[in-house]
Amino acid sequence: MIAIAYTLSFCFLGAQMIRWLMPQKSPLVRVWLGVSLGVLMEMGLPALCANALDFTVAAHIAAVAAALLLAAVCYAAREKAPLCAMRETDRRQLAVMAAVGIPLTALSAYLQYTHNIMPAADGSLWCGQATYGDLCMHLSFVTSLKNMRFPPSYSLLAGTSLAYPYLTDALSTTFYMFGMPLNLSLVVPGTLLMALTYAGYMLLAQQLLGGRHKAVTVAALLFFLNGGLGFLYDFDLAFTDNFARIREIFTGYYRTPANQPDLNLRFSNVIADLMIPQRALLGGWAMGIPALYLLISSAREKSYRQTALLALWASALPLVHTHTFLALGLFSGGYLLGNLVEHRQDRRGILIRAGLYLGAVSYTHLRAHETRSNL
């Protein structure tokens, strides 16, 4: 219960900060960005404070104080514009997000529960095929980060710095420290991050596609329910073998419609093979999509507030998921060149905002590297 209340407090602060900084965004975008910002602060601020207080309850209390300070800064820098109300296009977008996102989130909650040390009636513990390998590593991070001195080290190799983007696992450690069972410490934040990913993908698609809500729906379904045409091999002549190949989908080891090594078919489903087992990637997508949204929005609206928020957001990504940070960097470079070509009359403003963005991210990481070297 304490873990849930702690998370809700960060989400509330994040929603307020986005409300002050971007009041003219639609309510859907404000809520999604606000909750995402709250989760990002819950990931990063305790770890930041742990450099002085270790990853303890004291560091988590200090993280709340730091979040309140950031909220005060956002209030001081707030945009004094009327709050955007729900419009008809927002209601249609909400209907699309509910139709796609709610079933996917329910499926995700079930998969998170069944794939991450699910207790059985006889006392045994079970996991999924997809999580069988990764889960051991993530559990070691989640349990060992509790009360650990920072910067963190590998629990199985004393004295060796943890060279892994650990903030998603640190989020689970926070839940674990505040009394949540170990399996639910993976399930609850994992489900939350998956829900944010679904919502973020559809809002990003809306940003790019405009009011084409059917296209947003198709894009989301094609992305999250991918897998190729391997199912044809399972359902071809299914009646002749008493559905043996169909039963093997549920009982065979890594024999799925999307992944059939014997036939050299190796498609990976986004949900089953990436988001469920690869927790760093899950955190990276949940936090990387808002950064991408802010990048596009700040350029279109020529907003220095959004540029500053983007810079701080991007600065946290390497410890969430390094590949997401690299992808954001590549997209940022290409988007900068495209804007310079397309908006020649605003080249100076574009370069100033890009310089602030790049400078803030670079300075943050140079300072972090210098601090780490001195420890």
Language model: regions and residue ranges:
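Membrane-interface alpha helices of multi-pass inner-membrane proteins
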Residues: A272-M275, Q306-H321
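Membrane-embedded, hydrophobic transmembrane alpha-helices
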Residues: M1-L94
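Membrane-interface transmembrane helices that cradle and orient dolichyl/undecaprenyl
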Residues: G283-G284, G288-R305
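Perimembrane helix-loop-helix junctions
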Residues: L295, R300-S303, A327-G359
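Membrane-interfacial entry segments at the cytosolic side of transmembrane helices
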Residues: D54-A62, M86-V96, R212-A215, R344-Y357
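Transmembrane alpha-helical segments of multipass membrane enzymes and assembly factors
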Residues: F12-V29, N51, K80, G200-T217, ...
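Active-site lumenal/periplasmic loops and adjacent helix-entry segments of GT-C-fold
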Residues: L104-M287, T322-L326
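Conserved small/polar residues in nucleotide/adenosyl-binding loops
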Residues: T364-T371
